[in-house]
Each structure stands twice: as C-alpha cells, then as structure tokens.
Design a protein with these regions (language model features):
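Short, intrinsically disordered, charge-biased short linear motifs at domain edges
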Residues: 86-94, 108-114, 120-126, 140-148
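A structured, charge-rich N-terminal accessory region that forms the first stable segment of a protein
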Residues: 1-99, 104, 110-112, 177-183, ...
Length: 210
C-alpha cells in the first residue's frame, strides 16, 4: 500500500484519467469519483491529496472558497476553468442545497451536475425528472460534501449503500452512455445559468459534446 506522499509522487508522473470522460458542468464530487476509480485510490488517500489539512472523515464543502484550486489542478490535471465550474459559488443569489441532489438516469450514466445543487433547479434538463435527495431504499439523505466515505460510495447512500441510479452505473466515461441530445440539453442549461462563468473561465465545454 502506497503512503500518501508516494501517491502524490506517482500521480505527478501521470494519472489514469481522461478529461474527455467528463461532461459540461460535472460536479467536483462526480469528477473525483471517476478519478478515484481510474487510479484505484481510497477515499482517505484522495482526501489527503486534495485537502491535506482536512480530516478525511469530516470532509469539506464543495464550494470555491473552501478548496485550493491550484492544488486540485495539479492533482487532477484539469484546467482551472473546468474545476471552478465544478464547484458551487457562494456569492450567487441562489442558495446551494445541503443534501446531494441527483437525477437517477444521470446517475446511471455516472454523471452529476453542479447545477443540481442549486435550490431553484428542480428537474434534470436532459431527462426532465424531478431531482431526488433521498435514498430510494431507506430514505436517508447524503450531505453534499466530499469526504473519505463519500468518495468510497459513488452514487450510493451513505447510510445503507444502496445505489441512487437505475441499474449498474458506468463510473468512467459518461459520453458513450448518454445520448447526444441529452448531453446538448445539459450543456444548454449550463450555459443559460452559468454562461458568462463557463466561457470566461475557459472551461471549454464544447469538445465534451461532440
């Protein structure tokens, strides 16, 4: 088992991660689930890499003010614009929802959008389903944070470990699993809500929709 500093050295030489696996507006927790899966990282190891001063069991809020973007860029090897869009902006007038909100069909494709955490967004723009916060099996809610336990349970309830998705999900690339028209609908909604931010910060969502 590699020590945390050895994980960081190993990832500095290159990680098993392809930016083309991502969709426009993908939330940081969704990105981290893909990254952990591709690089066989435990929740504790990944938490230490992205926020070494944070207790992995306590976790950290997925907001821009609480996460060091430069470190995140170095570990994940993604453009800063992509990562900024993946995090909630606490300066926006709309409050973020404290519980993990998801579309069950998107979850089945291994995708979660940062837009789903905005309280005034109540439906998935691709599948037109109401966004859920409760586990389909036990009814519990999962807090919208990143922690060792959250990383270890992608698209699963923290209380009972039941899957939030329909059927077995693909953890890596969402692109082949989701219809192009659905990807376009998600991108359009993202641009409508965060258009200036997306374009100005250089997240370059267009290639992900090809």
């Amino acid at each position: 088992i590699l020590a945390f500093d050895e994980w960081e050295l190993s990832l500095s030489r290159g990680s098993a991660f392809n930016p083309k696996w991502l969709m426009p507006g993908e939330s940081l927790v969704s990105i981290l689930w893909k990254f952990a899966c591709a690089n066989v990282l435990s929740g504790d190891a990944l938490m230490h890499l992205i926020s070494p001063c944070v207790d992995p069991s306590e976790g950290i809020a997925l907001v821009r003010d609480d996460i060091e973007l430069s470190r995140l860029c170095r570990i994940l090897r993604l453009p800063e614009g992509v990562l900024r869009v993946s995090l909630l902006d606490t300066t926006l007038p709309c409050r973020p929802h404290p519980a993990f909100r998801y579309c069950r069909l998107c979850a089945a494709h291994g995708y979660h959008s940062v837009l789903y955490q905005l309280e005034d967004e109540d439906r998935c723009p691709a599948h037109h389903q109401a966004l859920d916060t409760r586990c389909p099996y036990c009814g519990s809610e999962t807090p919208y944070i990143v922690s060792a336990r959250v990383i270890a349970a992608p698209f699963r309830c923290l209380s009972c470990r039941f899957h939030c998705s329909y059927g077995r999900l693909s953890l890596l690339s969402t692109i082949p699993a989701m219809r192009r028209q659905d990807r376009v609908s998600i991108r359009r909604r993202l641009l409508l809500r965060m258009g200036n931010t997306v374009e100005d910060e250089g997240s370059e969502p267009q290639p992900y929709c090809d």
